[in-house]
Curated annotation (Swiss-Prot):
A GO cellular component annotation in the UniProt record: membrane
Name of this protein: Suppressor of tumorigenicity 7 protein-like
Name of a matching Pfam family: ST7
Spans traversing the lipid bilayer: 39-59, 83-103, 513-533
Stored PANTHER family: SUPPRESSION OF TUMORIGENICITY 7, SUPPRESSOR OF TUMORIGENICITY 7 PROTEIN-LIKE
GO BP annotations listed: negative regulation of cell growth
UniProt topology in membrane: Multi-pass membrane protein
Transport listed as a keyword: no
Length: 559
């Protein structure tokens, strides 16, 4: 979510003080009739309770309440201590089972089962209504819901990881060693959709090899995809997308992947030049040029990543810079994040600052790589001399204040990253797709950038001393933000789909235990204690039970 949108909304709110604030449902002041109706609707439950008490008091004589209470008291006085032991023991067992179920449901779904059932089923039966006064079909309500839905969808947008690993040379080798699958089906399905978007077009039927590859990208079974790629190469030895698939999924080393990508580059450049010559003939040829451009950019980018992994970092930087100059419209691929990581490896901090000056703009989307790299550069100037004792005694210098503010900005954007940088949580292989501001983005960033933070002396120490201060600045992160939009509430669900099951997903903000978990825990403990005391001291507990029943009877008789 861009900072520009945030400041634009703030400017509009300041410039139009009498206009309703979007998303909050604020409008013109209500009349006395509307306020009376709203007050009666809110006090309905209280009125019903008072009416019930009045009716009970009026019918106390016809219903012979005193006689009934006397009979109940006599019945309770005749019960033996064994009955109370059995009763409290059964109550403790039932409440314990409810407590265990509530705890399991909360950890799995993040909400209370009793609370959810109460809101979904019991509240409508008891006459509960929505707090909004607008009619469901009113234009204001529809516009508000449309705005909220659009904001929710933009928050939960999944992005392709610009530093994603190779399936054959990295992900599969991890599976061979550990026996664990690092990618989820949801993540791989998103990659299949990306491949169909990047590598296919409506003119594929004109070339048999492209028709075969179109089916290959839709195939879920990796051996079947690899087999289809070889079939496409038999039909056309210059099928670039077939080499791409083999480099991604069949190659078991980065060296093999680079060799296949170089073959794909030769074939892709031939097809790209041919498409450039025919692009103005028809809309179909323009679509074919866009597809061939995507293929060429993808191949060059992966070649740059191969060079980076093989230690030829300057070569990787050159390829990335050439890509960004030759294809500037393709900024949505976030090639600048690959460039930032490679420049940090070269310790070319001036070049890193130049890239940040271009992409850390108020009108451009942010990412953890941009925010935390900006914080790292400001931390680098003061981290070697930073001391918590000196800062506490003399205060922070201007440079230290700037570094701390940059850390707070980065932590507000993605609060999950510090735990991985400080090695408070173990890292896993990053997924192929990430959710910005989520745990998946934090893993992807820390996996590649942890070494850069360790290289700068004192950087992690300054981060450890200051990052938690962000949460004091934003006490209610889901309701309001400081420099960015409020933290989205959908990240946990999306991250659970993107990350493997053996990883414990980081959740922000930490969810408080629901009331019913505390209630059932207290009920279970108290009834178990009563059962134990009744079993150990039956006479004393019998006297206590009779005293409670007598007090209850006295209260009813007084009424």
């Amino acid at each position: 979510m861009a900072d520009g949108d945030y400041f634009a909304e703030a400017a509009r709110a300041v410039g139009c003080p009498h206009a309703p604030v979007p998303g909050l449902g604020l409008g013109p002041p209500l009349g006395w009739k509307e306020r009376l109706k709203a007050g009666l609707a809110n006090s309905g439950s209280t009125l019903w309770f008072l009416a019930g008490l009045g009716l009970l008091y009026a019918l106390r004589v016809p219903l012979r309440l005193c006689d009934n209470v006397t009979a109940v008291t006599g019945f309770l006085s005749s019960l033996t201590p064994k009955f109370y032991v059995a009763l409290t023991g059964t109550s403790s067992l039932i409440s314990g089972l409810i407590f265990i179920f509530e705890w399991w449901y909360f950890h799995k779904h993040g909400t209370s089962f009793i609370e959810q059932v109460s809101i979904s089923h019991l509240r409508p039966l008891m006459g509960g209504t929505e707090s909004s006064i607008s009619e469901p079909g009113s234009p204001a309500n529809s516009r508000e819901s449309e705005t909220l839905r659009h904001h929710h969808l933009s928050e939960c947008k999944v992005w392709r990881n610009p530093l994603n690993l190779f399936r054959g040379a990295e992900y599969r080798r991890y599976t061979w060693v550990t026996g664990k699958e690092p990618l989820t089906y949801y993540d791989m399905n998103l990659s299949a959709q990306d491949h169909q978007t990047f590598f296919t077009c409506e003119t594929d039927f004109l070339r048999p090899s492209d028709t075969v590859m179109q089916k290959a990208w839709r195939e879920r079974n990796p051996p079947a995809r690899i087999k289809a790629a070889y079939q496409a190469l038999e039909l056309n030895n210059d099928c670039a997308t077939a080499y791409v698939l083999l480099a991604e999924e069949e190659a078991t080393t980065i060296v093999d992947a680079e060799r296949l990508f170089k073959q794909a580059l030769r074939a892709g450049e031939i097809i790209y030049r041919r498409s450039q010559q025919c692009q103005h003939q028809s809309p179909q040829h323009e679509a074919q040029l866009r597809r061939d451009t995507n293929v060429l950019v993808y191949i060059k980018r992966r070649l740059a990543m191969c060079a980076r992994k093989l230690g030829r970092i300057r070569e990787a930087v050159k390829i990335m810079r050439d890509l960004m100059k030759e294809f500037p419209p393709l900024t949505m691929l976030n090639i600048h994040e690959n460039l930032l990581e490679s420049l940090l490896e070269l310790q070319a901090y001036a070049d890193v600052q130049a890239v940040l000056a271009k992409y850390d703009d108020i009108s451009l989307p942010k990412s953890a790589a941009i925010c935390y790299t900006a914080a790292l550069l400001k931390t680098r100037t003061v981290s070697d001399k930073f001391s918590p004792e000196t800062a506490f005694r003399k205060g922070l210098s201007t440079a230290e204040i700037n570094a701390v503010e940059a850390i707070h900005r980065a932590v507000e954007f993605n609060p999950h990253v510090p735990k991985y940088l400080l090695e408070m949580k173990s890292l896993i292989l990053p997924p192929e797709h990430i959710l910005k501001r989520g745990d998946s983005e934090a893993i992807a960033y820390a996996f590649f950038h942890l070494q850069h933070w360790k290289r700068i002396e004192g950087a992690l120490n300054l981060l450890q001393c200051t990052w938690e201060g962000t949460f004091r600045m934003i006490p209610y992160p889901l309701e309001k933000g400081h420099l960015f939009y409020p933290y989205p509430s959908c990240t946990e669900t999306a991250d659970r789909e993107l990350l493997p099951t053996f990883h414990h997903v980081s959740v922000y903000p930490k969810k408080e235990l629901p009331f019913f978990i505390h209630f059932t825990a207290g009920l279970c403990s108290s009834t178990a204690m009563l059962a134990f005391l009744t079993h150990q001291f039956p006479e004393v507990m019998g006297v206590f039970a009779k005293a409670v029943s007598m007090i209850s009877r006295t209260c009813v008789e007084y009424l």
